[in-house]
Amino acid sequence: METVFDINEIMKILPHRYPFLLVDRIVEYVAGERIVGIKNVSINEPFFQGHFPGHPVMPGVLIVEAMAQVGGIYAYVTLGDEVRDKVCYFASIDNVKFRKPVVPGDQLRIEVTISGCKRGIWCFSARATVNGKLVTEAELKATFADKEKL
């Protein structure tokens, strides 16, 4: 699996940092179509301390957040300088389905397909798989806002 963006490049694109940076690398980027990211799920993730002791499961909302971060990378790379000083935010999350639990040792493959962009709202369809099996799917919308207007 070839790396398109490694973690150092991702950290130049996304504002997220540990423990909330949930993308380890990007392995595919097709302008106008899709992006594929990888998240290696380790027992050392801080959320496993409480979710759930003795039965660690990655929280579904963090899988959705990882999907959003992969989509955000796509939008930041596509728009470049136009959004360099802006922050990408969720606008909506729809039709989320959690199919299987994600546990320590799993490698999440997150494929985000771009549905379009209208009036500054990006629309994405996202699928997360582990070993080729679907674990989560969702439809996401995101937009950019100026940092100083927050």
From Swiss-Prot:
UniProt-listed Enzyme Commission number(s): 4.2.1.59
Gene3D superfamilies hit by this protein: Hotdog Thioesterase
Reaction it catalyzes: a (3R)-hydroxyacyl-[ACP] = a (2E)-enoyl-[ACP] + H2O
Active-site annotation: 51
InterPro entries with a match to the protein in the record: FabA_FabZ, FabZ, HotDog_dom_sf
Keyword Ribonucleoprotein: no
Subcellular location: Cytoplasm
Key word Lipid metabolism present: yes
Annotated keywords: Cytoplasm, Lipid A biosynthesis, Lipid biosynthesis, Lipid metabolism, Lyase
Gene Ontology terms: biological process: fatty acid biosynthetic process; lipid A biosynthetic process
GO MF annotation terms: (3R)-hydroxyacyl-[acyl-carrier-protein] dehydratase activity
Gene Ontology, cellular component aspect: cytoplasm; membrane
EC class (word): lyase
Pfam families in the record: FabA (PF07977)
Protein family (similarity comment): Belongs to the thioester dehydratase family. FabZ subfamily.
Main function: Involved in unsaturated fatty acids biosynthesis. Catalyzes the dehydration of short chain beta-hydroxyacyl-ACPs and long chain saturated and unsaturated beta-hydroxyacyl-ACPs.
Protein name: 3-hydroxyacyl-[acyl-carrier-protein] dehydratase FabZ
Organism: Geobacter sulfurreducens (strain ATCC 51573 / DSM 12127 / PCA)
Upper classification of the organism: Bacteria, Pseudomonadati, Thermodesulfobacteriota, Desulfuromonadia, Geobacterales
Gene responsible for this protein: fabZ
